[in-house]
A protein has these predicted regions:
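Surface-exposed molecular-recognition determinants
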Residues: 2-247
Length: 247
């Protein structure tokens, strides 16, 4: 018979037993014949009956084509070239952090130009380091003479975008956007107009669940919007540069 009806939301399967004795549980999601006939209109919960995923459906859309983590050791002012699974020549954002030293977090991208950095742990305005990251390639990135001291271990998080940026007029403020609609990630730059209710196009084609904002020209914070941050996410934002929430 029907155990439940009218349920909504996300489902998680679990099994629990009370007591100190041990039990073995076997789950049958369709890998074996069912003991009873499934109700009309229902299918086994298995990969074959799930929708084809947008990410990972083919070798060209594997998740590591859109996001990668690179662990590297700096060669100092000699610079170096480091491999990645992301085609950074087609637009990317790189988030850099020294692991073996106390350093800031540095963000750079293809839209602003890879010599321009912002630090997520400070309120500082954009800085320019023309000899730090010198190239975003199709399967690697290159550092120059402004890289960390030789021997420093570093982590770089990399997100794929889509090009060096194109004009977007979807909002009341014109923006420059590099958007990967398949992976749901975009880089957006714009010039604010100090007008309440102004809108900015992001190029994704769907409502984003999260975004991070930082002024490039002013020493300001890093407000972070997330759809599930609290009951009023538009005003209940987080700030990257501090260790407490800003609800």
């Amino acid at each position: 018979g029907t155990a439940f009806s009218g349920l909504s939301g996300t489902y998680f399967f679990c099994q629990a037993r009370f007591g100190s004795d041990s039990h073995t549980t076997q789950w049958n999601f369709g890998q074996r014949p069912f003991a009873y006939t499934a109700p009309s209109g229902f299918k086994a919960l298995c990969t074959q009956n799930l929708p084809t995923p947008t990410i990972g459906a083919t070798s060209a859309t594997r998740a590591n084509k859109y996001f990668d983590v690179v662990l590297r050791t700096s060669n100092g002012n000699v610079g170096g070239t480091y491999s990645t699974t992301v085609n950074m020549s087609n637009g990317a954002l790189l988030w850099d952090k020294g692991r073996s030293i106390n350093s800031s977090h540095y963000l750079l991208d293809s839209v602003r130009g890879i010599s321009k950095t912002l630090s997520s742990d400070t309120t500082g305005a954009e800085a320019n380091y023309p000899n730090w990251f010198t190239n975003f390639g199709s399967s690697s990135f290159t550092t120059g003479s402004d890289d960390y001291t030789a021997g420093t271990t570093v982590v770089d998080w990399i997100w794929a975008a889509n090009g060096s940026g194109s004009t977007n007029n979807a909002g009341s403020i014109q923006s420059t956007v590099s958007a990967s609609t398949l992976s749901g990630f975009s880089i957006v730059t714009y010039t604010g107009n100090a007008t309440a209710g102004a809108t900015v196009g992001h190029g994704l084609g769907v409502t984003p669940s999260m975004f991070i904002i930082k002024s490039r020209s002013l020493a300001t914070g890093w407000p972070v919007y997330h759809v599930n941050s609290n009951a009023s996410p538009a005003t209940g934002y987080l700030s990257l540069q501090v260790s407490f929430h800003s609800f």
